[in-house]
C-alpha cells in the first residue's frame, strides 16, 4: 500500500470549542444543511455516533461520486481532535484503499486554527494523481469556509 499525505491549516474567528462542535461533532447535520450540493445526507449504519460508528454519506450533485462510507476513529473532546477514515464508496475510485482525515482544532487569540492531515492509502503501488489531491484539498477549503460562515451566523445555536 502506498501513502500520500497533505496537511492544511485553516484559521478562523470562530472559537475553538464552537468550531469543534459545529464543524466536526455536528458535521452530519451541518454539512447537508450548508452544502447540500456536496453532501445530501448522512446515514448511520453502525454505532451511536461515537468512536467506531460507521456512516454512509450520500453525496450531492456537485461531485462526480455518489457515496462514501466513513468510520469514526477518534473523538477527543478535551484535545479537540477528531479522526475518521473513508473506508468505502465510489469516492475511493480504483486507486484508493482508504482515506484518513485527522483534525485538531487549536485555540488562538480571537478564534482557532483547524489543522487537517489527510492520508491517502493507495492500493498496491498506485499513485493518486496530484491534480486529484489538489482538487480534494480545494473542495475541502471551500467547504470549511461555507461551514465557518454558517457557524458565525448561527453561534447562538451551538452549545
UniProtKB/Swiss-Prot annotation:
GO terms for biological process: abscisic acid-activated signaling pathway; defense response. The keyword Ion transport does not apply. GO terms for cellular component: cytoplasm; nucleus. One of its GO terms (molecular function) is abscisic acid binding. Keywords: Allergen, Pathogenesis-related protein, Plant defense. Pfam families: Bet_v_1. The keyword Phosphoprotein does not apply. Belongs to the BetVI family. This is Major allergen Api g 1, isoallergen 2.
Amino acid at each position: 500500500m502506498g501513502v500520500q499525505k497533505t496537511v492544511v491549516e485553516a484559521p478562523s474567528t470562530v472559537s475553538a470549542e464552537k468550531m469543534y462542535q459545529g464543524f466536526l461533532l455536528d458535521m452530519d447535520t451541518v454539512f447537508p444543511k450548508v452544502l447540500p450540493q456536496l453532501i445530501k445526507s448522512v446515514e448511520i449504519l453502525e454505532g451511536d455516533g461515537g468512536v467506531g460508528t460507521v456512516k454512509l454519506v450520500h453525496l450531492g450533485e456537485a461531485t462526480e461520486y455518489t457515496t462514501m462510507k466513513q468510520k469514526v476513529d477518534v473523538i477527543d473532546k478535551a484535545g479537540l481532535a477528531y479522526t475518521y477514515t473513508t473506508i468505502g464508496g465510489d469516492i475511493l475510485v480504483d486507486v484508493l484503499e482508504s482515506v484518513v482525515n485527522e483534525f485538531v482544532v487549536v485555540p488562538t487569540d480571537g478564534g482557532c486554527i483547524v489543522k487537517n492531515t489527510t492520508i491517502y492509502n493507495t492500493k498496491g503501488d498506485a499513485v493518486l494523481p496530484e491534480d486529484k489531491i489538489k482538487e480534494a484539498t480545494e473542495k475541502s477549503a471551500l467547504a470549511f469556509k461555507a461551514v465557518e460562515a454558517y457557524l458565525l451566523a448561527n453561534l447562538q445555536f451551538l452549545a
